UniProtKB/Swiss-Prot annotation:
It catalyses: an alditol + NAD(+) = an aldose + NADH + H(+); an alditol + NADP(+) = an aldose + NADPH + H(+). NADP(+) binds at residues 219-286. Monomer. Pfam families: Aldo_ket_red. One of its GO terms (cellular component) is cytosol. The active site is at Y49. Belongs to the aldo/keto reductase family. Keywords: Cytoplasm, NADP, Nucleus, Oxidoreductase, Stress response. The record marks K78 as: Lowers pKa of active site Tyr. The keyword Hydrolase does not apply. This is NADPH-dependent aldose reductase GRE3. Optimum pH is 5.
Length: 327
């Protein structure tokens, strides 16, 4: 099993977990179940991934068979953009809990600091970037005029009610987090961001350390996940798996792979990772990186020096320049 980090509310979270993004619903429940058997205890999901029923099914199966208890599993989900209004926050959370068949979440993120028009579950769920049939015909997205602090305070009420244990933010920049800290009652425990050697975001990571906010990395392998989504930038960016620096570091540690080096570069710097894999040997390899090898300070610096500020998951790019999340 992965080592644990202690969040600012005292809750302990595994440093290595399984990301549920793009796990096909047909195999998802079994993958979650098998991952638990291998030792995984952190599962990072989201309403937008469209597989929460299956994630919950895999978790509940493992619990029912006595492999784990609920308190052994750290379950994560995310509030989607269409449900930012305080009237809809708890509604969306309860939908997630109902789909997963669970009573509470260990961590619930605001997925993006972007508020869309509300879409009822019966109209489309998960709604993705849909804000109504008329908007869809026009290729338009209607925003909702909801300040992020209003959404956050609704989440604080969910903590009070025991529906979630922790609040996190995802895809937020430092200035927005700083503003949130000025007005929140319950501090966010984690920030989930795109983080890999092409996008190290060192100032943001340092800011989080100063404020005792755990950084969680997604897309640890850089362009790899986005090539499958036909993103042009990802297709034209050299893969990190074949990068000379990463390959050299891997060769310095016999038995390690380039993907494991990328993950170890993060965890050794205190950043949690949530890679996805369907192969047992890779799942085990990812889980065991902390025991397997330790990078030298120079290797950490050499990998960090690859930073090129290349961001693949940017709404500005794929939503026609209308949402300046990272501007």
């Amino acid at each position: 099993m992965s080592s644990l980090v202690t969040l600012n509310n005292g809750l302990k979270m595994p440093l290595v977990g399984l990301g549920c993004w793009k796990i096909d619903k047909k195999v998802c429940a079994n993958q979650i179940y098998e991952a638990i058997k291998l030792g995984y205890r952190l599962f990072d999901g989201a309403c937008d991934y469209g597989n929460e029923k299956e994630v919950g099914e895999g978790i509940r199966k493992a619990i029912s068979e006595g492999l784990v208890s609920r308190k052994d599993i750290f379950v994560v989900s995310k509030l989607w953009n269409n449900f930012h209004h305080p009237d809809h926050v708890k509604l969306a959370l309860k939908k997630t809990l109902s789909d997963m068949g669970l009573d509470y979440l260990d961590l619930y993120y605001i997925h993006f600091p972007i508020a869309f028009k509300y879409v009822p579950f019966e109209e489309k769920y998960p709604p993705g970037f849909y804000t109504g049939a008329d908007d869809e015909k026009k290729g338009h997205i209607t925003e909702a005029h909801v300040p992020i602090i209003d959404t956050y305070r609704a989440l604080e009420e969910c903590v009070d009610e025991g529906l979630i244990k922790s609040i996190g933010v995802s895809n937020f920049q430092g200035s927005l987090i700083q503003d949130l800290l000025r007005g929140c009652r319950i501090k966010p425990v984690a920030l989930q961001i795109e983080h890999h050697p092409y996008l190290t975001q060192e100032h943001l990571v340092e800011f989080c350390k100063l404020h005792d906010i755990q950084v969680v990395a997604y897309s640890s392998f850089g362009p790899q996940s986005f090539i499958e989504m036909d993103l042009q930038l990802a297709k034209t960016t050299p893969t990190l798996f074949e990068n000379d620096v990463i390959k050299k570091v891997s060769q310095n540690h016999p038995g390690s792979t380039t993907s494991q080096v990328l993950l170890r570069w993060a965890t050794q710097r205190g950043i949690a990772v949530i890679p996805k894999s369907s192969k047992k040997e890779r799942l085990l390899g990812n889980l065991e990186i902390e025991k397997k090898f330790t990078l030298t300070e120079q290797e950490l610096k050499d990998i960090s020096a690859l930073n090129a500020n290349i961001r693949f998951n940017d709404p500005w790019t794929w939503l026609d320049g209308k949402f300046p999340t990272f501007a």
